[in-house]
UniProtKB/Swiss-Prot annotation:
Interacts with itself, dan, ey and dac to form a complex (or complexes) containing the RD factors. Disulfide bonds: none annotated. The gene is danr. GO terms for biological process: antennal development; compound eye development; regulation of DNA-templated transcription; segment specification. PANTHER family: PROTEIN DISTAL ANTENNA. It holds the Pfam family CENP-B_N. Its main location: nucleus. This is Protein distal antenna-related.
Length: 432
């Protein structure tokens, strides 16, 4: 037997004269099957391979399995590219390619283009749409009341035409709207601070020499009040009580200044829960060490009470809307207004004058409107939270504003910082 005829078929002969070992690869078997498909007889192919014809027929029956085994071996062991037909070679090449991921179907191919909203009809401002959706989720989580949402919609509907023309984003417009509302409140505060700075510079340091011009300015301020920490929720119907509480009965304290003892009654009427423990611990002269603010006469108060109060109602309504929108309480509003009033207006007033600015706020100390207070802060009037409410920061700030009045009058004996510290210490001891 000629062994050279089997060299190209990768057949090894262990010894001469014996049948060759049939360690044919699947590639060799597939090549033999392809030769049969090309027209060669099975006898000639079986004679070349050295296998019986029955074995070759078995290979032809298992042709698909043999081709699968060739694909598993990889392209290095194939070698049948020239013998396979084009259609089978194309299918074979597709099996070797990496699998393609299924692409998403087109929107119009799904037959949804006849719907009300198509993919091409959406505006290009996608960020504004996402921000509106996030705003809706924010409102749901924070639990804003539906009435407040309707009021917010009414306020935004006024600027709808301007937004359509300018194309301003919804979140930016919302922020600008709220900053405008805050600017209106702070503009009233800064306007009053400017007037108070002028009156403090022009007025003498002693409180005993109060002129008629100062009384006229105070009367005009009480007739047309501005938004401050003390009168932002005032009730004009209760102004008549101040005529009885502000009868001047001068006493002399340890600094020899004119002191009104009825101011302690005023403080007790306004802050009853704070001043009762203070009165029980400290004597009457210690509580009444704060000088009284100058008030107008009974005729001026009567004329102011008969004047229309639309400005006050508008201020209360604007404040209530602000409170509903920001979900704030009375403590936060009083703290913000007091902090804004303590700062100098425009940054042009020196620091020595800025410490004296809240002195004119005592000119307009009116009782709080109970209805507005209850609507703004429901927890403030509950029996369980009275102590926590009066221990909060806005009440301390109001005491500081009153103490700044006494610091200006007692500047000959002590500094404003010391007077403020002593008044706060008295308040903390009284609360304990």
């Amino acid at each position: 037997m000629d062994i050279s005829a089997y060299q190209h078929m990768n057949i090894r002969m262990s010894t001469r004269g014996k049948r060759p070992l049939r360690n044919l690869t699947p590639n060799d078997k597939v090549r033999a099957i392809q030769r049969i498909h090309n027209g060669e007889t099975k006898a000639s192919v079986s004679r070349d391979l050295g296998v019986p014809e029955s074995t070759l027929r078995g290979w032809c029956k298992n042709e698909q399995k043999l081709r699968f085994m060739c694909r598993q071996l990889g392209p290095d062991h194939l070698g049948i590219d020239t013998h396979t037909p084009p259609e089978k070679r194309a299918k074979f090449d597709l099996q070797l390619l990496p699998p393609k991921l299924a692409t998403l179907p087109n929107y119009d191919d799904l037959g949804l283009s006849n719907f009300l909203f198509s993919a091409t009809e959406f505006p290009t401002q996608k960020e504004s749409l996402f921000e509106k959706l996030s705003l809706v989720e924010f409102v749901k989580k924070n639990g804003l009341h539906p009435s407040a949402i309707r009021e917010l919609g009414d306020t935004h509907s006024l600027n709808a035409a301007a937004n359509a023309v300018s194309g301003v984003d919804y979140s930016t417009n919302n922020m600008i709207n709220q900053l405008t509302l805050l600017a209106q409140l702070n503009s009233k505060l800064s306007y009053q601070m400017g007037e108070s700075a002028d009156t403090d510079i022009k007025s003498p340091q002693s409180t005993t020499d109060i002129t008629d011009t100062a009384r006229e300015e105070n009367s005009t301020k009480t007739s047309c009040p501005l938004l401050t920490v003390k009168n932002w929720a005032k009730d004009p119907a209760k102004r008549a009580h101040f005529n009885q509480a502000t009868q001047l009965n001068p006493n002399n304290d340890k600094n020899n200044n004119a002191v009104d003892p009825s101011y302690s009654n005023l403080t007790t009427m306004k802050y009853p829960l704070i001043m009762e423990p203070v009165k029980s611990i400290y004597p009457e002269t210690t509580v009444s060490a704060i000088p009284p603010p100058p008030f107008s006469t009974y005729s001026d108060l009567a004329s102011a009470a008969s004047a229309p109060t639309t400005d006050n109602d508008c201020q209360g309504a604007a404040l209530l809307d602000w409170c509903k929108l920001f979900n704030a309480s009375l403590n936060f509003l009083a703290f913000a207004a007091a902090a804004a009033s303590m700062q100098p207006a425009g940054g042009t007033i020196p620091k020595s004058t800025a410490t004296q600015l809240p002195a004119t706020e005592a000119d307009e100390t009116y009782p709080f409107n109970n209805n507005l207070v209850k609507r703004l802060s429901p927890l403030a009037h509950s029996d369980a939270s009275n102590e926590s409410y009066f221990d909060s920061e806005p009440e301390d700030l109001s005491v500081r504003s009153c103490a700044s009045v006494s610091s200006r009058n007692n500047s000959r004996s002590q500094t404003p910082d010391k007077s403020t510290a002593t008044s706060i210490a008295c308040l903390s001891d009284g609360e304990q």
